[in-house]
């Protein structure tokens, strides 16, 4: 018995679009390239009309009774569909969870660096997981870690909102921040406007 191949070497089967001669329905509801209804027409007559106009007969909806076809330039239609799909992929941003790690005994410069990282992640539209790591007996000072995380949330108040308040998880304390959808109006600016 010959050994089984590890993977299928055949090219994937491409699903060809139902255009022109590939349409097998005898009766079709035909729509003109301008959007005008031509009515229910025999398939051969619809193909003749499309050929006279030097356009393609494209099956738009085969679930309708009779199936709906449109006379159009298929190459242009395909290009526009690909362009729309590409734009949709561009606009859909997958939000990721980025992590900022620190110890509760963090120096000022290191803290500022973590704030800068968090701001960069939030501006990119990602959520931020702020983690304070405990080593050994440091876990006894979880109140200091909570204070640090709340200070961080306060410093990032303009760019983010707290999604999950600080809580202990094993030997870490974590807090989740998500990007602020509406800009925060500072209380100081409100006080100046009222005066």
UniProtKB/Swiss-Prot annotation:
It is found in: Cytoplasm. The keyword Protein biosynthesis applies. One of its GO terms (biological process) is ribosome disassembly. Residues 185-195 have a biased composition (Basic and acidic residues). Keywords: Cytoplasm, Initiation factor, Protein biosynthesis. GO terms for cellular component: cytosol; membrane. IF-3 binds to the 30S ribosomal subunit and shifts the equilibrium between 70S ribosomes and their 50S and 30S subunits in favor of the free subunits, thus enhancing the availability of 30S subunits on which protein synthesis initiation begins. NCBIfam families: infC. This is Translation initiation factor IF-3. It comes from Prochlorococcus marinus (strain MIT 9515).
